[in-house]
UniProtKB/Swiss-Prot annotation:
Protein name: Mannose 6-phosphate receptor-like protein 1
Disulfide bonds: C63-C122, C182-C216, C197-C228
PTM annotation (Phosphoserine): residues: S335, S339, S342, S371, S380
Lumenal side: 24-236
Cytoplasmic side: 258-381
Residues of this chain annotated as glycosylated in UniProt: N116, N136, N178, N215
Organism: Saccharomyces cerevisiae (strain ATCC 204508 / S288c) (Baker's yeast)
An annotated Gene Ontology molecular function: signal sequence binding
Physiological role: Sorting receptor involved in the transport of vacuolar enzymes from the Golgi complex to the vacuole. Involved in the delivery and maturation of PEP4 (vacuolar proteinase A) and PRB1 (vacuolar proteinase B).
Gene: MRL1
Length: 381
């Protein structure tokens, strides 16, 4: 009965625990493939119904992105001229001075390109002086090397950063397209910004020029603390649910499981005590034998262990005997040249036994002769 109760209890605990552990292991979603399928389905639904009002979960984020795998939230709008409102848990991060905190455009040294670039993030860096040559949609530009009065656009700014890398989604990028004409006369200049999380940086952002391809595509790296992910409400809810689930399992194990088995055990022992009071011969087995009675497998392994111990002890005894025989104990030898083989030893012991029998017979004869002398004296008298 106790074994059956224990099996029922363990099966109930496993049925409750396994789904929660699977949920914790897979994170906010069921799997990476399910998250990607859900994201693609969401994109198709948005393209199919562009006029349909979007819910709070499906709204387009301005210069921000939510990681579909971890549920974390990254807001790059703090680097633009129109930042979003801070969410719960976000802190206002400013530079060392007011100018740095209000900075919305950056001048980047073009190493090896003999010019400087001016960039904006999710906004246009074009001011009044540049508005005559460039559109207010321009996200990045530079001064022409041949004509300093000529400004060249390398892409219109975008407000939709993207996470690339498949199921891992580790790279955060932002593309600027539809710039000035490339030297080939067919394509237009474009820019790719790669964002890197940097919590040690002192300024809002640090932009570095990486290189270009055919003077048509330009690559930059943006290091900023605003590129670091923050917690999301959904993620916090998931963590709270996991905590509640663990507490529920602990409650079931502690109060429902352990105490139920303890009550069953006490009831069983009380019944055994009653039977013992009625007839002591019916309950000769101690209570701890009922509890510690193992399964067949445990008995099998215990038997193997005992057999191994016996074999080891016998082997050690044989080794000790062999060592004593090699070291040479106290032996009786008939002559110095006696052999140490077993056959010689047997012959030696046989000779010794024969000698002992002869000595015993001599002692018996001597006793008989001594007893005969008084009778002869009496006869003479």
């Amino acid at each position: 009965m106790l074994k059956r109760s224990s099996l029922i209890y363990l099966s109930c605990v496993l049925i409750i625990t396994i789904p929660i552990l699977l949920h914790v292991y897979n994170g906010p979603g069921l799997s990476h493939e399910a998250n990607e399928h859900r994201a693609s389905h969401k994109q198709k639904r948005t393209l199919a119904n562009p006029d349909k009002p979007k819910s709070e979960n499906d709204e387009d984020l301005f210069c921000a992105v939510t990681n579909p795998v971890t549920g974390s939230y990254i807001d790059l709008s703090q680097l633009s001229s129109t930042p979003n409102k801070l969410r719960e848990g976000q802190k206002q991060i400013s530079g060392n001075n007011k100018h740095e905190s209000s900075k919305t455009k950056w001048s980047v040294r073009g190493w090896g390109y003999d010019t400087n670039f001016t960039l904006g993030i999710c906004s246009s860096p074009v001011g009044e002086a540049e508005s005559q040559q460039l559109s207010n949609l321009t996200g990045a530009f530079y001064v022409d090397q041949l004509n300093e009065n000529n400004l060249v656009s390398i892409g219109d700014f975008s407000t939709r950063p993207a996470l690339v890398g498949g199921s891992t989604a580790k790279k955060l990028t932002l593309k600027y397209e539809n710039g000035s004409m490339c030297p080939n006369g067919k394509d237009k200049k474009a820019t790719l910004l790669n964002f890197v999380c940097d919590k040690e940086i002192q300024s809002k952002a640090q932009i570095s020029y990486i290189g270009n391809l055919h003077n048509c595509s330009y690559f930059f790296e943006v290091r900023s603390i605003h590129a670091c992910p923050t917690s999301n409400k959904k993620n916090e809810v998931n963590v709270l649910g996991i905590f509640i689930g663990i507490f529920a399992i602990f409650f079931l194990v502690e109060f429902a499981g352990r105490r139920w088995i303890y009550a069953k055990l006490n009831r069983h022992l009380k019944n055994d005590d009653e039977l013992h009071d009625i007839s002591p011969s019916l309950n000769e087995q101690p209570h701890w034998d009922l509890i510690e009675d193992g399964s067949r497998w445990s008995k099998f392994f215990n038997g193997i262990i005992k057999t191994t111990r016996r074999f080891t002890k016998s082997l050690m005894r044989s080794l000790v005997r062999g060592r004593n025989s090699r070291q040479g104990g106290i032996r009786l030898r008939s002559s110095p040249s006696a052999s140490s083989s077993s056959l010689a030893n047997r012959e030696f012991f046989r000779d010794m036994e024969a000698q002992n029998e002869i000595i015993d017979s001599l002692d018996i004869n001597s006793h008989t002769t001594e007893s005969d002398h008084p009778t002869l004296a009496d006869n003479s008298v």
